[in-house]
Amino acid sequence: METLKGLPVANAINEKIIEEMKDWKGAIPHLAIVRVGERPDDMSYERGATKKMEKVGFRCTSYTFPADIDNDTFLKAFEKVKVLADELVAEGSYHPTYFEMLFLMGMVIFADAGVDYVTLETGLGGRMDATTAVENPVACVITSISLDHMQYLGDTVAKIAGEKAGIIVPGVPVIYDGNDPDAAEVIRARAEELGSPAYEVKRSDTEVLRNTSAGIDFAFRNEYYKDMVFSIPFIAKYQVMNSALALKTIEVLQNVISVSMDQIHVGIAGTRWQGRMETVLPGVIVDGAHNEDGVEKFVETAEHFQKECPLTLLFSAVDDKDYTDMIHTICSRITFRHVVVTSVGGYRQVPAERFAKLFTEAGASSVEVVEDVEKAFGRALEVKGDDGMLFCVGSLYLVGEIKDVIRRNKK
């Protein structure tokens, strides 16, 4: 059995459970799967690829989390997988981990639903991930790589890329973000070693033509797409790379997936990703950025818009995130009309006064503490006015509570 920092990993479940699952409507061998290694900030790749294939008429689904599965379906899948898990334990093996159980349940649900294509996002993301149990994906995609999950994946981009490259399958095409030279070198070498065709996508392959609060128009310049212009409903420029990776995947799979350019345009324009630079009201953007790379991408976007209108910030974070560095990064490059801070996260919450002190020390000129999230959001909207933009940043807990407030107020 292989382990990762002492934890049992997916390879131990491959033989017995996967063989058993082959009898369940061919759950593993007959689903057409696009395996994706990505970070939370890049999940729009998965959404974009899925949306394009849905527009062609395929039944598609995504493996990210079980939020969209009804309770009965979820329970039936659990009971089916638990039988096999109990057999493993009885034979002296280990019980599948929480994430391995979810993966196996996902495969059962997808097979029973009769989907045509699955975009399968890795969990931790690579060599030791439960999703590597799938042996025959139609493509493997690796989005941008940064220093994340370092305690498990390594302390350099190259080491993390080595783990991410573990999703590559011999002979199966791999499409990857080639902007970081260290990561790109590792991915290329692994693809060559396995005889897998490798397709690199870089920022220089794209050109942003328009970037407004309504979205982005961009060109993806290559022989297949020529100088076509695509529109995406995102305001963050990093989403252009994710969209380009999805477009490249469709191109590489053109002999597998029959799709017209019109369908591609409609699919990419209809892509949505909740909680990541998501416009929830006119001029109001929520972003669950909570790590170094996510905050950097938020700042890049806010820098663009601060040239056009005054910005207001609603901020909160939980205690296991490096919120001090987050605040310093934000304040070093963005000037806000007003900053409202609040507390989220239950037992992990940080007193809002702590955030206020840090923002003031970092140079923010107007900072206000509002402990109640709903009241904090209302106050931030009031300050935003008709002429500005409001960014709600720092935690997915904050994003969730704000979206809940908006839903309640619509009733």
Give the positions of each predicted feature.
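C-terminal helical cap/extension that packs against the catalytic core
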Residues: 180-190, 195, 283-284, 327-389
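ATP-dependent carboxylate-amine ligase catalytic core
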Residues: 67-135
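Acidic, Mg2+-coordinating active-site environments of NTP-dependent enzymes
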Residues: 88-89, 114-121, 137, 142-229, ...
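Positively charged, low-complexity intrinsically disordered leader regions
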Residues: 1-27, 151
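Glycine-rich phosphate/diphosphate-binding loop of Rossmann-like nucleotide-binding domains
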Residues: 36-55
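Nucleotide phosphate-binding/pyrophosphate-handling subdomain across enzymes
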Residues: 117-120, 128-141, 145-148, 159, ...
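Short internal beta-strands
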Residues: 33-35, 63, 173-178, 313-315, ...
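Short beta-strand elements in bilobed, periplasmic/extracellular small-molecule ligand-binding domains
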Residues: 53-66, 366-368
